[in-house]
Amino acid sequence: LTLMAFVTVIGFDDIMYNFQNQGMTVITSWILMLFLYVIPYSLMVGHLGSVFNHEGGGLSSWIRGTKGEFLGYFTAWTYWAASVPYVVDSANSVVVGFGWAFTGSNKFQDTMSNASFTFWTFVTFVIFIFIQHHLKNSMEILSTIGGGMMFIMTILFVLLAFFGLAKSGGHMATQPMTWHTIIPKFDLKYWSTVGMLIYAVNGCELIAPYVTQMKNPRREFPKAMIALSVMTAFLTIFGSFALGIYFNAYHLPNDLKMNGSYYAFSALGKQFGVGNLFMYIYAWTSVLYMCALLAVLLDAMTRMLISDTGEKYMPKFLRKTNKDGLPINGYLLTCGLSAFIML
């Protein structure tokens, strides 16, 4: 469950996005965010998940149980609709990841027309719905493999980056590197980027619908949230510093948000004399990770919408599930709306 939550909450690309926005000052921002948001929010989710451990709607079940059925229904629809663009973005990232995994560069997506990119993104949706429908426990398998590999690759990047820093005599691409480099200037520009930090580490409530599948949810679910907080702290703080070793935070590439993760592992491999080996390993890791994220998002947001919403608010055909308890018609609704957004 911790790896499923890790998949929805944080990834290497989330670190890259905010490094692009704030540079090395993002280290301080991550520390503040951990204590002011990540840890308290994870503990709240852990507590609510352990209390409402027999309901399968997650956030919508919590609101329904505390504020009434209508607000529970309103929460379910609102959260589902707000998550659809994120699902589309995750499917896009799967296509980008395959491009890097096969070509070792960004040529695949750069030479593709918008229509072709949209087509392959839609194909990704169809494949995932087919897999979810026919392969039992596919989401759990993808989450374990994708989340585990991404965490391992992050640890590998951080450890090798610090080893490379010592090997090079302390030379960093970010110069000058002083205490002032990591202290943000709390102006309007800074505050306008804080929302991206929250967006990056948000999402642990998505795995709440699976609390009903745990053997001892009252004890195990809070533990999963605590483990998630520790993993997030390591990835955000040390990962951001490691990026400053290979990228000059004062002069960053324009396409860092889309391709920065691949540039980082390529630079790491070249420093250690293995060429693009690390980059290719990361590319396939990213594909598995984004596939896991897409699977969890499709399933969790649909369950949140359908699993514990009052019958008078939810049409019967949407509440229909297959023999494994999967809301297939809900998947199709999500896929249809995603296709509309892409078009």
Question: What are these language model-derived features?
Answer:
Residues 1-96, 206-207, 214, 225:
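Transmembrane helix-boundary motif of multi-pass solute transporters/channels
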Residues 17, 21, 50, 123-149, ...:
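Membrane-water interface regions at transmembrane-helix termini and the short interhelical loops
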